[in-house]
C-alpha cells in the first residue's frame, strides 16, 4: 500500500510538471518590434503582442530601462508602443533600442531588440575636386555624405542630370562618377546631388579641363587609378568593388578570388568598365578579390586587392529545452548560435540577466544551476547578440518539491582553526531528520564575483566537518543541505567566517633602475591575495654593497610600491632584497638582487628603459618597455641579458633600436630569472633596468585534480629548558598517504633578521628544537609534504623559552655611612635580558677577619627593593659588602666586595653629627642625591642643626673670626677638601666619588649658590646687590665680610662652603690627614681595590686621571702640592700658621 501511494505521488508530480510545461508553452510573442526609421515629428508604432495564459502584462524598455509613459509615449491596448511625435534633440531623443517584456504567472519573456532611428541627411564629407586630364584618358569625380536612410546620389553636368550609365559614363551607388575616353565635349562643371526621405543636397561644382592629346599617343603600361577598397557589408545587401585603370591601349579589367574559388556569376555583374557588383551578399561571398588590369595582347598587367567581410546576424543552432528538477538537483541549459561577428550569449531569467555565483555558472553557451531551490523556478531565455542584431530562445525550469522532505539543517556554526581550515558544525533538521541519508557542505569565497562554489558530500553520522583547503585571510560563505530518498531540504542559513592570516608566501619581485650615478629606484608590485595570505602591513627593504657586509634596512608602509635610495656610491654593485609582513609576522625575504650604479661620468647616456615583464606561459616571458622622454636621440639599440637565479649571467643580446617588445622562450617552469635591459648610444651604454620574474608551473591534469594536502593540526609547544622547546602535532585528517615529511619553522617573535629563521625537517610528529635563546618568545609553524605536494603552514603557535638564573651581578653597589654604627647599601638591578625578573636580592657583609673565616651576615630584600640598612656595626672595623640577584631559576653571582670603615668613638665624636661616606664597587666615591632620598628625614635634621650653628657662630668674637680666616689663607690659598667641586656636574652624576668625612672647620651644605660662609657669615666675591638682600640678617658684619673675599679661596660656582671654629677644641688633630683628609696619591691603592685601610677617612680614592686631579686638590694645600718630595709639615704648626694668616686678612694693618 505504501509503495502504491509513493508511485501515485510520483505520477502526480510528473503529470503536474508536464502540464506546467504545456501551460508555459502558451506564453510566446505573436508580434515583436522591428527596426524602424522615422522622420522627426512622425508617429511611430512598435508592435508587441504576446499569447499565453491570462492575465498577461506588457511593459516596454528602452536601452534596458523601463519606459515611463506619457501623453506622447504610451502603450496601446494590444501591447504595442505608440510614439505620437518622434523627437530628436541632444537632451531628449527617442532614438535607441526598444524591447517589450511579457509576463504571466509562470514568468516573463523578453522580445528581440528593435532600433528606432531618426532620418537625417548631413553635409558632404567629401566634395568633388576639379581635375585636368588628357584627351582620350579617364576622369573620375567622387563625393561622400552621411545619411539615414542611405541617400541616392546622382550627377549633374553643367547643372543637367547625367544618365546613370552610358557607353563612356558610369555613376556608381557609392557616389563616384567615371568617364572613360574623355573627349573635349566632356569639359565643364560637375556636381553631385544626394537625396533621401529627409531632404536633397547638392555639392559644390568641380571643373573638368581636357587638354589635347599628343599625336600619335605613346604606349602606356596599365595603371590602376582607383582600386577596390576593403568592405564590410551586412548579409543580403549589395557589395561594390570599384576598379578603374588607365593605359594605352585601353587595359582590360578582370576579377578573381585569392582562394581560387569561382565567382558567383548568378549574383555578380560588372558595372561600367570593370566595376564588380555582388547583390544579395551572403557569407560565401566573403574573401579577398583581385582586380587585374592587363594590356590587350600582352602580359603586362597590374593588380589591386580588397577584402569583403560579410556580417551575419545571429541564428540559433541549438536552443534550450524546458526541464523539471527536484529541489537540490541540477539543471543544464544549452544555447548555441552562429553569426559574424561571433554572437555573445546572455542568459535571462524572467527578463532579467542571470548573475553568476557559486550555485549558478555560465560556461560559454551553457547555463548550469546547482542545488536548485524553489526560487530558481521561472522562464530562462538565451539571447545571442552581435552588431547585426539579436535572437532569443526560451525554456522553463520547474522545481518539484516533496511534502516529506526534511527541514533545513539548523544552527550552523563556523569556527576558524587555522589560516587554511574552518570547522563547521550544525544541528540535525527539526523535521524528518531520521530520514536524512547524507549532507552536502557548500562553501565559496564571500568577496568578489563569479566565485566558484565547492560541494562536499558527507554521511549522516556526523554533524561536524573540517574544511582545510582554504586561502589564508579570506572570508568564506557556508551553507548545508540535507538529503533524503525523496529529495533535498532547503538550504540552511548562510554563515560567513574568515580564515586566519599567515605570513606572506613569498616576497615581491623587485625592479631596479638608476636615475643618476648615486641613486637606485626600487619598485615592486603588490602581492596578490593568494601570495600575501592576508593584508600586507609593512615591507622591509635591505641593501648593502657587494664588498661590505654592513646592512641597511628600511621599514616601509604597506601602501608603498617604490623607494628611491639616494646618496649611494657611483660605479658600485649593490645587493638588495625585500620582505613583506602581515599581522602574523614577516615572510621569507627575496633572494639578493644585484644592481650596479652608473659611473660618475655617465651623465649623457640614455636613461634606463621602463621595463614590464609578463609570463605568457610556464616557459615564456614577454618584455615590453619604453624610454623616458628625451632618451631616444642617438639611440643605437638595446642590450638584453638574463639568467636563472643562482646561475652565472649569460652573454648580452642586442635588440634593434625600433623594437619595444621581446620574447624570451625556453625557460624552466617554477624558476626565478633576473632580466637586465639597457639602451646604448654613441655616448656609451645607458642606465640599466633590472627586474626579476618567476615563471609559473605548467598546468597539468594532475595539478587541476589534486588539491594540496591540509596542514598539520593541533600543534602544541612546551618549553623544556632555557634553550629548547618541544613541539608535537597531529597528522591532518583525511590524509591517506603513508609517507609523510614535515618542515618546522621557528623564529623569534618580532624578528628583525630573516636569516634567524630556522627550518627543520623531520618525519616524526614531534621535534625538540634546541639552541634557542633564553627568555625569548618564539613562534612555530609546521607544514606537511606528501607526494611532491606541500600543505600550507599550520597556525602559528607561540612559546617562550625558560629564563636563566642571573648571569650578572647588581651594578652601582654603594655603601653610605649614616650613623656611627649604621650604613645604607644601595644598588641597581643587573642588566641581563636573558634572565627573568629578579625575585630577591641577597646582601652579604662581614668584617675583614670574619670574611676570611667565612663567617658573614646575610640580608635578603624583595626584587623591587634596591637598598638595605646595615645596623649594629662595630666601630674601628673595616666591613666588606657584596650583593647578588636571584630569580626563580637560581642565584646570580655576587658583586665585587665594597669596603666600609667604621670610625672609633673618639673619631666619631670629632665628626659631630651627620657625616656620610659613599663607597662604590668600582672604586669611585660620589655624593648621590638619589641615595640620600632614603634618609631625607636625617638630612633635614642635619640641615636644621647647621643653620642653628651658623646663627651661633655669627655672634662670636671678631678675634676668633680673624684667626680662622688668617689660618686658611696661609695654607696656600686653597679651599678645604670639601669645598672643591667636581669638574662638572655630569661627571659627578656618572663617576661617583666618596667625599671625606667632615672636619670641625668645614661643612659642605651642598647648596646651589656660590656663597662661602665662615663663622662670621656669608662671603662672596663681588656679591650682587640683589643677592645681599637674601642675607639681610648679616648686615651688621657686611663690610667686614667683603674684606674676607680673597683669591686665597678656590671658588667654584654652585658650591656653598660653611666655615666655623670650635670654641675650645678638646681633641686637636694630630696628623695632617686629620685636617685635610687622606693624601691624594695613596700609593697603596689600585684601580681595582675598593674601600679604605684603617684610617680616619672612609674610603680610597681612584687613580683615574681626572679624578686624581680633583682628589689631590682636596687632599693637600697648595704649599704641599708644589713638590711631592718635601718634608711633611707638622699639623700643629700648619694650623697656627693658617690662623695667623687669617687674622692678618681680616684685620689689615
Curated annotation (Swiss-Prot):
Cytoplasmic topological segments: 954-1149
Region of interest: Disordered: 646-666, 1060-1149
One Pfam entry name: Ig_3
Location in or out of the cell: Membrane
Bias-annotated ranges (Polar residues): 1061-1073
Record keywords, A-Z: Developmental protein, Disulfide bond, Glycoprotein, Immunoglobulin domain, Membrane, Repeat, Signal, Transmembrane, Transmembrane helix
Ranges of Basic and acidic residues composition bias in the record: 1084-1106
Taxonomy, superkingdom: Eukaryota
GO cellular component: membrane
Principal location: membrane
Tissue: Expression begins in the posterior region of the embryo and this posterior restriction persists at the 4 s stage. At early somite stages, expressed along the neural tube with lower levels in the lateral and paraxial mesoderm. Expression decreases caudally and rostrally becomes restricted to the ventral part of the brain. Widespread in the spinal cord at 30 hours post-fertilization (hpf) and is also expressed in the lens from this time. At 40 hpf, expression is restricted to the lens.
Domain Ig-like per the UniProt entry, residue ranges: 27-117, 122-209, 222-309, 314-399
Glycosylated residues in this chain: 78, 230, 300, 307, 460, 475, 617, 720, 741, 753
One Gene Ontology term from the biological process aspect of the record: negative regulation of neurogenesis
Family the entry assigns: Belongs to the immunoglobulin superfamily. DCC family.
Protein name as it appears in the record: Protogenin A
Organism: Danio rerio (Zebrafish)
Gene responsible for this protein: prtga
